[in-house]
Amino acid sequence: MIPPADSLLKYDTPVLVSRNTEKRSPKARLLKVSPQQPGPSGSAPQPPKTKLPSTPCVPDPTKQAEEILNAILPPREWVEDTQLWIQQVSSTPSTRMDVVHLQEQLDLKLQQRQARETGICPVRRELYSQCFDELIREVTINCAERGLLLLRVRDEIRMTIAAYQTLYESSVAFGMRKALQAEQGKSDMERKIAELETEKRDLERQVNEQKAKCEATEKRESERRQVEEKKHNEEIQFLKRTNQQLKAQLEGIIAPKK
């Protein structure tokens, strides 16, 4: 007989219920884990409301305690070689040494399973949930009312953790979307920067070409202006000489007549 995974919650000795489970429903073949085991790290369902069994008019205290324990912490079942085994939560009262041993086992399992001391840690949460369920079991045996009150506290804590986990997952998803959008925006911006740099280089090339053309044009115009000025000066000098000659000839013609 291979029992289920070890737990800090104290159970009685497993009892063989049936030797043939071929005709049982598939659900009975699966290991039924009591609600003190936390769910996977990916989901934290809301714990179900615990329904307490009805008690007779003159209840047996031991019987009533067992029924309350089974309602709070349901027995776990598993199938091995077509044999159905069931294991109920122990109804044996605990002693001070049991509490000390529970603390030692908790510390040992935290160390063995390398649970993180801070931050979110599914392993640490699972072990502390088992420890809390064991404390609920011990208190319920001595006082059912206190046990039921602790059960309400446990369920409230689980609902709060489930709400925080849902909020955390949605925040992570929102952060991932924003990161992807930022990455996409970064890629678009880098592509736009590359296009602008290419356009800048093309404009700089055009500016250099226009500068070269402008310098060549200025040089041509300067040379042409110098040639025209030289030609203009030569024409002026020619006209001055012609004017002097004509003036001398005119004076020569007019002078003898006097």
Swiss-Prot record:
Single GO biological process annotation from the record: sperm flagellum assembly
Entries under InterPro entries matching the protein: Axonemal_dynein_light_chain
Coiled-coil region(s): 176-255
Source superkingdom: Eukaryota
Protein localization: Cell projection, Cilium; Cell projection, Cilium, Flagellum; Dynein axonemal particle; Cytoplasm
Region Disordered: start-end pairs: 1-60, 207-231
Keywords: Cell projection, Cilium, Coiled coil, Cytoplasm, Dynein, Flagellum, Motor protein
Impact reported for I120M: In a colorectal cancer sample; somatic mutation
UniProt feature, compositional bias: Low complexity: 34-44
Distribution of this protein across tissues and organs: Expressed in many tissues. A smaller 0.9 kb and a larger 2.5 kb transcripts were detected at the highest level in the testis, at medium levels in the prostate, heart, liver, lung and pancreas, at low levels in the ovary, skeletal muscle and small intestine. Not detected in spleen, colon epithelium, thymus or peripheral blood leukocytes. The 0.9 kb transcript is expressed at a 20-fold higher level than the 2.5 kb transcript in the testis. Expressed in spermatozoa and airway epithelial cells (at protein level).
GO molecular function terms noted in the UniProt entry: dynein heavy chain binding
Gene Ontology CC: one annotated term: nucleoplasm
Keyword Coiled coil: yes
Pfam families: Ax_dynein_light
Connected disease: Spermatogenic failure 83: An autosomal recessive male infertility disorder characterized by asthenoteratozoospermia. Patient sperm exhibit an asymmetric fibrous sheath of the flagella.
Function (record text): Involved in sperm flagellum assembly.
Family note: Belongs to the inner dynein arm light chain family.
Complex and partners: Interacts with CFAP45. Interacts with DYNC1H1.
Designated name of the protein: Axonemal dynein light intermediate polypeptide 1
Gene, per the UniProt record: DNALI1
